[in-house]
Each structure stands twice: as structure tokens, then as C-alpha cells.
UniProtKB/Swiss-Prot annotation:
Protein name (database record): 5'-3' exonuclease
Cysteines engaged in disulfide bonds, as pairs: none
SUPFAM superfamilies in alphabetical order: 5' to 3' exonuclease, C-terminal subdomain (SSF47807), PIN domain-like (SSF88723)
Pfam families in alphabetical order: 5_3_exonuc (PF01367), 5_3_exonuc_N (PF02739)
This enzyme's EC code(s): 3.1.11.-
Function: 5'-3' exonuclease acting preferentially on double-stranded DNA.
Domain 5'-3' exonuclease: 176-269
Annotated GO MF terms: 5'-3' exonuclease activity; 5'-flap endonuclease activity; DNA binding
A single BP term in Gene Ontology: DNA replication, Okazaki fragment processing
Gene name linked to the record: polA
Length: 291
């Protein structure tokens, strides 16, 4: 069976930047180009490529354009801090370096990087290709299935935790991947500014889903709930369904590139070395020059 690696570009670029943010101050002090995210992201992705024999490789990014989620819910992600300008200027170079490494780098207006990952994951598994997804975003856990594993960064840029069908319940509150969006519909998600239902915390949300399975089934059994829960949930099904929908990753968008274009390409060594030299990333330049 062939293997695909799908990477959440925004998520890992953020992690690469903030794991090495001290180097930004050094660059400012010495009037050097910002390169910490470029170097760290490139090294992370190179190491991931060495971890398994991958046949396909896709790295997805968000665009600046509003998504369908923004149009449905104006408060979506509204509390997130602005991306540091020192990272923003590195993102185009990060993308260029990853193309030189052999990845298909993609983005589509109207959708988030997660939606591209979800749609490429579905495309791969439909073609009997096993998928590894790398991110620090727990939203992607909903994509775990018999052919798809999700690896989340848990510490810095090196420590990863794998979620698969064998260990998922143990690592995610006893729930299933399909219940991730049900959980977010009830409990919410602060990182995306999804409030969930006021009065339903993680423990109560988990208990309800373990007993009833889905939001629809919880409300179908409304009369069996305690009076306290009935008071909390009264008239809230539309709210829960809205936040569940907003948390759902699309797996059926029309992709700009097909599976053939997602095949990993040979490293463009010359272009990569020129980029590393331009941005003063000498140690990596030396490493890749020896390949």
C-alpha cells in the first residue's frame, strides 16, 4: 500500500516560529533577514519525510480570503491574535522551500487548510493510499479512520502523538472520531471562538455523548434528561448544530490538483540551496549539499 503525508502548513509554521522566536530578536539586532520559521519548518518537514516511505505529499495553507465559515458566523476565530509580521514575511518563502523539497503546496480561497487536508485525505483513501496527517490542531482528529492517522504536536517541534482507530477512544475521552464535531457543538472551542452551549462543560458533554452518541439523539431523548439539563438545553439544538457544522472539516471540495500532482517530487537541490543561501541558513545548506 502506498502512503501519503498531509501537513497543516499554517499550524506547523506557527509552531516553528514560536518555538524559535528568540532568533527573531537576534535577527533584528543584527539586521539579518528573518529565517527562523523557514529553517525550522523545512527541517520539520524533512524529518517527517525520513520517518516513512511516502509516495504523496501535500502541504496546505489558509488564504487571506473569507471562508464560508466567516460568512455563516461573523465571530468565527475573531479572538485570535494577529499573526506577527515577522512570521508573515516568511510564509511565502516557507512555501517556496517546501515546493523545492518535493511537496505539492496548495491553498484555495473560501476554504481553510483543514478542508484541503480533509479533501485530500478522502481522495487518497479512495485510491487505497494510507494517510498520515500532521498538525497541532485537534479539529483534524475527526478525520481519523481505518486508513488515516493524525499526528499532533504536543511539545515544541519534535514530540508528536499519534491518533488512530486503535487508540482514539483512550486518548480522546472515550469518544469516536465522528463525535469530535458533536463534542465541539456542545462544549465549543475557544480557539475558534465557538461558544457551544452555555452550561455544558467538557465532562457533561462527554457524558452526554457517551450515553446518546449524537446531538440529534440527545435532543430526541430530551424528556429522559434531568430537569437541570433540560433547563440548560431547552431551545439550544440549533446552536449546537450550528457550532458542530462550523467545526466540521469538508472532505468533498473540488480540488485544484488531482492525486497525480500530489505525488512527491525529487528534491530540487539547486533551487533549495540557493534559497537557503539567500536567507543565511548555512547549517541546513551544508546538510542538503551533502545529499
Amino acid at each position: 500500500m502506498k502512503n501519503a503525508i498531509l501537513i497543516d502548513g499554517n499550524s506547523l509554521a506557527y509552531r516553528a516560529y514560536f518555538a524559535t522566536w528568540q532568533q527573531v530578536e537576534f535577527a533584528k539586532l543584527h539586521n539579518l533577514p528573518f529565517n527562523n520559521a523557514i529553517r525550522t519548518m523545512l527541517m520539520m518537514c524533512w524529518n517527517l519525510l525520513q520517518s516513512k516511505q511516502y509516495d504523496y505529499g501535500v502541504i496546505s495553507f489558509d488564504t487571506k480570503a473569507p471562508t464560508f465559515r466567516d460568512q455563516l458566523y461573523s465571530e468565527y476565530k475573531s479572538k485570535r491574535s494577529k499573526t506577527p509580521s515577522e512570521l508573515l514575511v516568511q510564509i511565502p518563502v516557507v512555501k517556496e522551500s517546501l515546493r523545492h523539497l518535493g511537496f505539492l503546496v496548495c491553498e484555495q480561497d473560501g476554504f481553510e487548510a483543514d478542508d484541503l487536508i480533509g479533501s485530500y485525505a478522502r481522495l487518497m483513501t479512495q485510491n487505497n493510499v494510507a494517510v498520515d496527517i500532521y498538525s497541532s490542531d485537534r479539529d483534524l482528529l475527526q478525520l481519523v479512520d481505518s486508513m488515516t492517522s493524525v499526528w499532533l504536536c504536543v511539545k515544541g517541534t519534535k514530540e508528536m502523538k499519534e491518533y488512530n482507530t486503535d487508540n482514539f477512544a483512550e486518548q480522546f475521552f472515550g469518544l469516536t472520531p465522528k463525535q469530535v464535531i458533536e463534542y465541539k457543538g456542545l462544549v465549543g472551542d475557544n480557539s475558534d471562538n465557538l461558544t457551544g452551549i452555555k452550561g455544558i462543560g467538557p465532562k457533561k458533554g462527554i457524558d452526554l455523548l457517551k450515553q446518546y452518541g449524537t446531538i440529534d439523539n440527545i435532543f430526541a431523548n430530551f424528556d429522559k434528561l434531568s430537569k437541570a439539563l433540560q433547563t440548560i438545553l431547552q431551545g439550544q439544538i440549533d446552536t449546537a448544530k450550528k457550532f458542530s457544522f462550523l467545526a466540521s472539516i469538508k472532505t468533498d471540495i473540488k480540488l485544484n490538483d488531482d492525486i497525480v500532482h500530489a505525488a512527491l517530487k525529487p528534491i530540487d537541490k539547486q533551487a533549495l540551496l540557493e534559497l537557503l543561501d539567500k536567507y543565511g541558513i548555512k547549517a541546513l545548506a551544508q546538510k542538503f549539499s551533502q545529499l
